[in-house]
Amino acid sequence: MVGDLSDVRAMEQDFPSTRNESGYQRFRLGDFVFSRDEYFVHIEWRAQGKKLSHTMSADVFLRALMRDVAWNFFYGWVNFDDVFGTRNRYDRVELYAGRYHPVYKEQGLDHSACFDSSFVMQAFRSMLDDWTNVGYDPFAAPAETGLTWQGKKQGHNRAALNRARESCRRMPGLPGDVPLRTDRNRYPINRAFLDVPQDEPVIEAEPGFEHEVHAFNLFAYLSRSDVTWNPSVTSVCKHSLFCPTTEEYILPVKHANDRIEWFLQLSDQIEWRIEDRATGRPRASVVMRAGDVAAMPADIRHQGFSRRRSMLLVWENADPRLPQLYEDGILPPSLAGEFQEPGSVK
Amino acid sequence: MSFTDTKTVFGSLDSYVKGGIEVIDDDRRHYAFSNVFEVASLAKPYEKVVVGKNLRYVIETLRAEGTSDWFTASHDESVIVMDGSVEIDLVKLDDPERIAPAHIEGSIRLEAPPQGRRMGLMKLRRGHQALLPKGAAYRFRSTDGVGVLVLQTIHGPHSVEKWSEICLT
């Protein structure tokens, strides 16, 4: 959940900021300094007594920052690009620059630092609030939000930044659970999914079971998503979470999970660029079309490319013990060991 | 800005195009890559073929053809209809602990018709997702030829794993 931004001003003294000639605030978290101008975000740090800097498109940075905040730093590593990112250490967050880039690492020019998650969250929310201009929605597809991220500081777009991530307890539409998406609650059908049938299942519940006999139109629910690359939760089986999402253009981060996660492509196509988690070395390209299922191993980073808006079911195991079990090598990073000789059935 | 593709492409048993893996420096088996329509096309009716596995949690693909046996579980499950039309009967078991005690996970097949109160009927089409509540017995009935279901559950005695047969290698 992004949460309310009304309290961020009170926190600014913890990461002192000043405004530059473009009107944007400058932020410092430990030895990391963040600034933006009309086009770019600049990240600075020190290593081996030298000042290092890294520049990203402000558009790319804000899209990544939005996911990191909305996902509460997600599982594992959220690489904003090949150099900068965050690692969720659960209650703590590690910020790094060059840590997982072979050249920065080899030259000793990488830097990382851990902070309390709440502190980084407040800082990132403040950064998002200040650096997002009116009209720009970091969750929207580029075709929907245009180029309003450019230029000198101009206003805010807090409505876009304050969206809450929709996580059901059992299933959307059940009494007391997250509501279904409709025109009435301001979830119109997205322009790319106007052809998706909106019929709801027929439910014939016996008296007394109206709250337990439940189904909904998942594809219609997704057709009304107003965000891209931002999974919601639509069903729960203990730690097993079905997290469907709609994707368009490029996943703004290279996500390196601290556990195996799975994708089930529900519609259209996504191409995944797979790299080694620690070095970024290319490993594979995975093309997923409707009906395809694939695991994302626990030792990779992945980035998706969706040429039109598509529906993807992300499947997560939210067991909090998993990061340590993979880190310690107790669990293998992939399912390769499950394969038997052809024809055998376990 | 306009885009040429305005049609959403879903898959079906009759029309699916499987993707693939371009290996650069890797092993295809790491991705356990399969396709639910292809798996269902080769499966027996309501065979619970595991297509995703995350420790004890699984995603199973079921070929919906005719009427299934009755199943229950000690935990919530959910099902998505990927193709076809399916009806689901639900019965609140009088004694769910006897068939699926809390320490037993996964779908359990009932050996006899369920004893309990009828909860209702759900009629689902492609894209619909239904809750299969814990302690309830359920059965599927395909109403429009052969369909494809995706089940969110936990590995159980009826789960079938055949990774080498279904995955790209």
Predicted regions located by residue number:
Chain B
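A short hydrophobic beta-strand segment most commonly corresponding to one strand
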Residues: 144-163
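Short acidic-glycine-tyrosine-enriched beta hairpin
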Residues: 93-136
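His/acidic/aromatic-lined binding-pocket segments of jelly-roll/cupin-type domains
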Residues: 69-71, 76-81, 122, 130
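A short, N-terminal "cap"/entry segment at the start of jelly-roll beta-barrel domains
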Residues: 1-60, 67-69, 166-169
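Conserved short histidine dyad/triad with adjacent acidic residue
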Residues: 58-75, 92-96
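Tight coil/turn sites that cap or link beta-strands
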Residues: 62-66, 126-127, 133-135, 145
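Short hydrophobic/aromatic-rich beta-strand segments that constitute the beta-sheet cores
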Residues: 88-90, 151
